[in-house]
């Protein structure tokens, strides 16, 4: 898994991601999962229409870039992209890239939060693809995205449909201005939800 800090320089973020993906492959990883919306900073902390310019089609520039890297390294990659489906319709989409660089499948985030610092409903339309696992050379992946983890039926549907492992690209964090005790309670609750899957 690659989880890294990102800045406003998207090309620099992508180069850093590619370097970290290479490190994972050098250590023997056959499957590498990137964090939610990994090409940029997590922009959903603000409602700003101009940020919709970050969206891209799938297939598109990111699937081409990461597809070439997956093929070069012989790994399966799970991406998390800001998808422009058509004018005015955007999704938070996980894309699975197979070892040959092709798109094995994608999943559009179904459960969209609208909480302080997570104003995703401003940007994303809920997914419309159901809970269909994606067949890959490393197994059948039940790919969901971040907030979906709080809805157990998503994991249940993926498992019932044949998923061998569940994957959640995630950008969720804590409120670091909260007291340390409260941060621990929140972290423990999140971990308990994950174990419940």
Name each model-derived stretch.
Residues 53-143, 195-196:
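Catalytic-core segment of enzymes that process non-peptidic bonds
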Residues 13, 24-50, 70, 77-78, ...:
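Active-site beta-strand/loop signature of hydrolases that rely on acidic residues for catalysis
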Residues 14-15, 46-49, 92-93, 110, ...:
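Short, glycine/charged-enriched secondary-structure capping and boundary segments
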Residues 12-23, 151-157:
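Short, acidic/polar
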Residues 55-78, 140, 146-197:
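CN hydrolase (nitrilase-like) catalytic-core segments centered on the catalytic cysteine
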Residues 38-39, 83, 111-113, 171-173:
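Active-site-proximal loop/turn and secondary-structure-junction residues that shape catalytic pockets
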Residues 1-7:
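Short beta-strand segments enriched in small/hydrophobic residues
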């Amino acid at each position: 898994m690659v989880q890294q800090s990102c800045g406003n320089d998207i090309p620099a973020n992508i180069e850093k991601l590619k370097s970290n993906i290479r490190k994972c492959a050098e250590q023997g990883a056959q499957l590498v999962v990137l964090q939610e919306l990994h090409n940029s900073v997590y922009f959903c902390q603000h409602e700003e229409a101009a940020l919709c310019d970050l969206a891209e089609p799938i297939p598109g520039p990111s699937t081409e870039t990461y597809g070439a890297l997956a093929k070069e390294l012989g790994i399966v990659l799970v991406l998390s992209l800001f998808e422009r489906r058509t004018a005015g319709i955007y999704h938070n989409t996980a894309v699975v890239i197979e070892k040959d660089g092709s798109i094995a499948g994608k999943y559009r985030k179904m459960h969209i939060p609208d909480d302080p610092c997570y104003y995703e409903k401003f940007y994303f339309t809920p997914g419309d693809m159901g809970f269909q696992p994606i067949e890959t050379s490393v197994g059948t992946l039940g790919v969901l995205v971040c907030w979906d983890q709080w809805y157990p039926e998503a994991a249940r549907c993926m498992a019932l449909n044949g998923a061998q492992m569940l994957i959640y690209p995630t950008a969720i964090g804590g409120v670091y201005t909260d007291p340390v005790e409260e941060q621990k309670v929140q972290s423990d609750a999140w971990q308990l939800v994950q174990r419940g899957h």
